[in-house]
């Protein structure tokens, strides 16, 4: 015959198991969360009635409206790595793409000479904030898989973006290798 003491012991075990995830989570709150980021590279396009393009405002100090295709041509899934590099008068971002991204970058740059790539980025712990970072002019075919541009952000924001995008890229490639 079971008594209340036996049931109480099982209840305490279940209570401890239920509280365990909360205790573990509270112990981890002191750890710094990994940065995360997202990248979308769009191509300039003519306005169309089909709704496949949209105007976006690039540059905060002197906004410029650029009409883009809604679907990005490149994302962080195509990226190998990103880095902040020294450039004349400041810094720039260098995005190095994988084989598929290199092919896409070459095809779109060759076919859209005289237009713009338009780069959107999101970064931070929650990736809630994001903005249009740049609209680099396409002056030649880019066959080396590297897109370099001066972003509309501070050096600190650029460092956060690069750390987050490299972490996101690492997670994507880790998932593909499993």
Where are these regions (language model features)?
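Sec-dependent bacterial lipoprotein signal peptides
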Residues: 1-25
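Structural signature of multi-pass, alpha-helical inner-membrane proteins
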Residues: 2-6, 27-178
């Amino acid at each position: 015959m079971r008594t209340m003491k036996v049931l109480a012991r099982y209840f305490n075990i279940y209570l401890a198991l239920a509280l365990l995830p909360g205790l573990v989570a509270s112990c981890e709150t002191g750890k710094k969360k990994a940065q995360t980021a997202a990248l979308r590279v769009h191509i300039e396009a003519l306005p169309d009635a089909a709704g496949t393009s949209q105007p976006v405002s690039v540059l905060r100090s002197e906004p410029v409206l650029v009409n883009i295709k809604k679907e990005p041509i490149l994302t962080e899934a195509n990226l190998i790595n990103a880095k902040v590099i020294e450039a004349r008068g400041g810094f720039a971002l260098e995005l190095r793409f994988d084989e598929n991204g290199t092919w896409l970058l070459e095809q779109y740059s060759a076919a859209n000479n005289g237009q713009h790539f338009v780069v959107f980025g999101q970064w931070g712990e929650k990736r809630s904030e994001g903005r249009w970072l740049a609209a680099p002019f396409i002056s030649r075919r880019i066959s080396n898989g590297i897109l370099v541009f001066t972003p509309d952000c501070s050096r600190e924001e650029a460092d956060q973006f690069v750390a987050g995008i490299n972490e996101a890229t690492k997670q994507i490639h880790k998932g593909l290798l499993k």
